[in-house]
């Protein structure tokens, strides 16, 4: 297979610099583009390594599907500045879409989101007509459990490194309401007629098959559900899930 052109780059979002990895298809010429949205980090200081393996996925999409692919770190993770908030991460996704739109030969922009990144990708797609379609992998339908106790969530966010600035947020309760207000089921109907691809492992311990089914159904005829037998929550490490995702990308129609 041909090599891709890849570069480490940055994106500006609300004046915050986000770190990113862009992979370019080897064949050159017009091609569709996709932004890859990561989920929440886990473990102490996990934000520093958040999305560390996503550039590999971007490279593979560019190489095997012939797409422009962008793996970026939302604010508060990886090499990106800023602090986590739902509104901030949604702004970061919009900034990634704008970045891809500026590629001269990009033929439309799609989103791929994993875990919580998939949930926010659904919200972003519903709100932004520039986005041609969305794939959500192992994505929870809401963040209500996260937002139920804002103080505890903030403690977690500081522990993993998603929130670094003293005094942030100005209002813990308002910050928490932004988290608990996330509802992919309410957003999904607004995606149609653009496609929503929902991928779930049948052994996922965090998101159930029924959760995924309800999300796909919420998009009506635009929704498509695929299940990976025996796969857990870390779908991006399962070759069957990756193959299913790439098959979906191959079926998309560029502008």
Which sequence ranges carry the predicted segments?
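N-terminal cap/lid segment of alpha/beta-hydrolase-fold proteins
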Residues: 1-28
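Alpha/beta-hydrolase active-site loop
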Residues: 53, 83-104
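Conserved alpha/beta-hydrolase
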Residues: 56-79
């Amino acid at each position: 297979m041909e090599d891709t052109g890849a570069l480490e780059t940055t994106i500006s979002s609300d004046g915050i610099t986000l770190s990113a990895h862009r992979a370019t298809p080897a064949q050159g010429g017009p091609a569709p583009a996709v932004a890859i949205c990561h989920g929440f980090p886990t473990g102490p200081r996990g934000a520093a390594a958040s999305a560390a393996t996503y550039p590999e996925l971007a490279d593979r999409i560019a190489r095997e599907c012939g797409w422009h692919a962008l793996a970026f770190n939302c604010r508060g993770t990886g090499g990106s500045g800023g602090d986590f908030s739902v509104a901030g991460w949604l702004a970061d996704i919009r900034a990634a879409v704008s970045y891809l739109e500026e590629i001269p030969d990009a033929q439309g922009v799609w989103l791929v989101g994993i875990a919580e990144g998939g949930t926010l990708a659904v919200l972003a797609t519903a709100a932004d007509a520039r986005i041609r379609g969305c794939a959500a992998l192992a994505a929870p339908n809401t963040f209500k459990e996260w937002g139920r106790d804002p103080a505890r969530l903030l403690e977690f966010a500081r522990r993993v490194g998603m929130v670094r600035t003293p005094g942030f947020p100005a209002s813990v309760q308002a910050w928490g309401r932004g988290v608990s207000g996330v509802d992919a089921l309410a957003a999904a109907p607004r995606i149609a007629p653009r496609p929503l691809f929902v991928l779930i492992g049948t052994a996922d311990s965090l998101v159930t098959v029924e959760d995924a089914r309800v999300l796909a159904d919420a998009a009506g005829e635009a929704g498509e559900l695929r299940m990976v037998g025996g796969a857990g929550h870390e779908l991006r490490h399962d070759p069957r899930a990756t193959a299913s995702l790439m098959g979906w990308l191959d079926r998309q129609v560029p502008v």
